[in-house]
Amino acid sequence: MLRTMLQGKLHRVKVTQADLHYEGSCAMDQNFMDAAGILEYEAIDIYNVDNGERFSTYAIAAERGSRIISVNGAAARRAAVGDKLIICSYVQIPNEDARHHKPNIAYFDGDNIMRRIAKAVPVQVA
């Protein structure tokens, strides 16, 4: 049996561009992709913190160091410049390996500056 597990996450990045007429995708700073282990053309899910939209597309690289997050094509109708996003990729792992799997999680401030990288989501307390 395979389990679908979180592989990489960009937590609370800010949309810097939304281009309805660009070929579909989400362009992101290559440094961001490297931190989360997201590959170019990999399927990603995007969760818009500001409006609750959830959608799928694929990743493409933007210039390294640019801090760009550009939502393109039809997806541009689901995210506006300034919106905060959570961008995730997933991997299928054999059941026996799933309990030991650790995702790559990059956390950002409001200016798309990476503040830390982690291998787990903090435990939620009451």
UniProtKB/Swiss-Prot annotation:
Example GO BP: pantothenate biosynthetic process
UniProt GO cellular component terms: cytosol
The free-text cofactor remark is: Binds 1 pyruvoyl group covalently per subunit.
Q: What is its EC number?
A: 4.1.1.11
Which GO MF terms are attached to this record? aspartate 1-decarboxylase activity
Q: Which residues carry this modification: Pyruvic acid (Ser)?
A: 25
Q: Which SUPFAM superfamilies match?
A: ADC-like
Residues bound to substrate: 57, 73-75
Matching entries from Pfam families are given as:
Asp_decarbox
Which metal ions or organic cofactors does this protein require, according to UniProt?
Answer: pyruvate
Spell out the reaction equation it catalyses.
Answer: L-aspartate + H(+) = beta-alanine + CO2
Active-site residues?
Answer: 25 (schiff-base intermediate with substrate), 58 (proton donor)
Q: What modifications does the entry list under PTM / processing?
A: Is synthesized initially as an inactive proenzyme, which is activated by self-cleavage at a specific serine bond to produce a beta-subunit with a hydroxyl group at its C-terminus and an alpha-subunit with a pyruvoyl group at its N-terminus.
Pathway it works in: Cofactor biosynthesis; (R)-pantothenate biosynthesis; beta-alanine from L-aspartate: step 1/1
Under InterPro entries, the record lists: Asp_de-COase-like_dom_sf, Asp_decarbox
Q: Where in the cell is the protein located? A: Cytoplasm
List keywords of the entry alphabetically. Autocatalytic cleavage, Cytoplasm, Decarboxylase, Lyase, Pantothenate biosynthesis, Pyruvate, Schiff base, Zymogen
Q: Main EC class of this protein?
A: lyase
Quick check: keyword Lyase in the entry?
yes
User: Quaternary state and partners of this protein?
Assistant: Heterooctamer of four alpha and four beta subunits.
Q: What does this protein do?
A: Catalyzes the pyruvoyl-dependent decarboxylation of aspartate to produce beta-alanine.
Please give the family membership noted in the entry.
Answer: Belongs to the PanD family.
What is this protein identified as?
Aspartate 1-decarboxylase
Q: What is the lineage of its organism?
A: Bacteria, Pseudomonadati, Pseudomonadota, Gammaproteobacteria, Enterobacterales
Q: Could you tell me the gene encoding this protein?
A: panD
